[in-house]
């Protein structure tokens, strides 16, 4: 059965999460995987949510549902984000990968908004879980440097 490429992306996500585990501790592999996932997400986010093809032998139209941007974020990005919420290197690469993922000219505004929501969640996790103020500030600067718009500011001053 054709999974539309999501099966391979899930395997890559699993490799990234395992590479970050204390038993394996291979951040280089995790970085490589996140970079590659950013490129794949860029391609996947360009597909429309529905496609239709008329069969040549009649009046039958086959409608295909492609995986939504929201499902991609839940299946591919969230596990990496949640597992690496204390790792500023992976968080930095994930910010860059997600920014690249929505950089194409054929990405819908709806898909961009879904990725921006994931970036909001990443920013929230960063503010809440990274204790070192210098590291935290370095990663937060990425949001400005990459000109990421529509991100909410979370007040975590009491944390």
Label every model-predicted segment.
Residues 1-159:
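Short basic (Lys/Arg) and small-residue
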């Amino acid at each position: 059965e054709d999974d539309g490429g999501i099966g391979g992306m899930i395997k890559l996500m699993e490799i990234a999460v395992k590479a970050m585990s204390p038993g394996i501790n291979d951040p280089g592999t995790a970085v490589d995987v996140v970079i590659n996932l950013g490129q794949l997400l860029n391609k996947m986010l360009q597909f429309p949510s529905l496609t239709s093809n008329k069969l040549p032998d009649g009046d039958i139209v086959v409608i295909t549902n492609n995986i939504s941007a929201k499902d991609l974020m839940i299946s591919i990005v969230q596990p990496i984000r949640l597992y690496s919420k204390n790792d500023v290197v992976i968080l930095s690469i994930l910010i860059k990968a997600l920014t690249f993922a929505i950089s194409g000219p054929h990405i819908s505004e709806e898909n961009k908004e879904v990725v921006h929501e994931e970036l909001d969640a990443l920013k929230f996790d960063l503010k809440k879980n990274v204790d070192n103020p210098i590291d935290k500030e370095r990663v937060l600067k990425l949001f400005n440097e990459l000109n990421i718009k529509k991100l909410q500011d979370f007040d975590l001053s009491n944390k």
